[in-house]
């Protein structure tokens, strides 16, 4: 599966299911293969759904190099105990101190991110931003494209994208993740989507807490920008 030219993102946990054999749950977990690395971005709300969907995806945790936690809410950290059981000592990148002790106690190795952090030549964790809670995102980039993975966008997705532009001197073309727009008006969704497009975003996969209203708005008004989601879906870029 590790093709250096391909970036593969497998949605393990999401609020909806793309494949009938995958369970849905309010939460997020993405399995990523990119540039000789395989890793998890968030771990869903509980060990059970996380474990069963990983099994359905035929993903062996022994192949995982590290885990990035976007923020320390339960619907993104629920699978950590299962990871600890299978991969004790695995590196877990977190955006603040709030779960450091817990992560150490269950036998994993937490690293608190304070600023833009380069994991490899093409993989970066962004500087954590205040939400609340404090949240970090992940960027995968090469000469052609830049992909931003967002957990819940508590700091605001436009703020996250503008910070990425500041850090990398270019806009992410692709956003995959929770936009935290499930409880805002259609007018607000319109403003945010249009701002993202004006910054330079070309494709949005509005999963997890983005809201049905957001998905429908993008799909109806900007079908070329909309990307589908749901547990069991594979995005290849």
Task: Give short role names for the model-derived ranges.
Residues 73-79, 146, 153-235:
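Cap/insert and terminal regions of metallo-dependent hydrolase folds
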Residues 57, 88, 106, 200, ...:
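Short, structured coil segments at secondary-structure junctions
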Residues 37-39, 65-66, 88-91, 145-147, ...:
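Short active-site oxyanion
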């Amino acid at each position: 599966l590790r093709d250096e030219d391909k970036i593969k993102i497998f949605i393990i946990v999401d609020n909806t299911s793309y494949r009938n054999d995958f369970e849905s749950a309010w939460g997020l977990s993405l399995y990523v293969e990119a540039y000789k690395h395989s890793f998890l971005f968030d771990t869903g709300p509980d060990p059970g759904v996380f474990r069963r969907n990983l099994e359905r995806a035929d993903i062996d945790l022994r192949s995982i190099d590290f885990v990035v936690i976007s923020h320390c809410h339960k619907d993104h950290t629920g699978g950590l105990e299962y990871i600890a059981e299978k991969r004790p000592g695995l590196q877990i990148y977190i955006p603040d101190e709030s779960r450091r002790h817990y992560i150490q106690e269950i036998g994993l190795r937490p690293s608190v991110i304070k600023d833009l952090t380069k994991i490899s030549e093409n993989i970066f964790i962004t500087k954590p931003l205040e939400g609340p809670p404090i949240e970090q995102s992940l960027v995968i980039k090469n000469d052609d494209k830049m992909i931003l993975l967002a957990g819940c966008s508590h700091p605001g997705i436009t703020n996250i994208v503008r910070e990425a532009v500041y850090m990398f001197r270019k806009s992410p073309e692709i956003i995959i993740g929770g936009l935290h727009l499930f409880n805002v008006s259609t007018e607000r969704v319109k403003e945010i989507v249009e701002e993202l497009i004006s910054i330079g975003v070309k494709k949005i996969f509005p999963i997890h807490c983005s809201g049905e209203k957001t998905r429908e708005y993008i799909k109806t008004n900007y079908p070329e920008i909309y990307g589908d989601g749901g547990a069991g879906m594979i995005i290849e870029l």
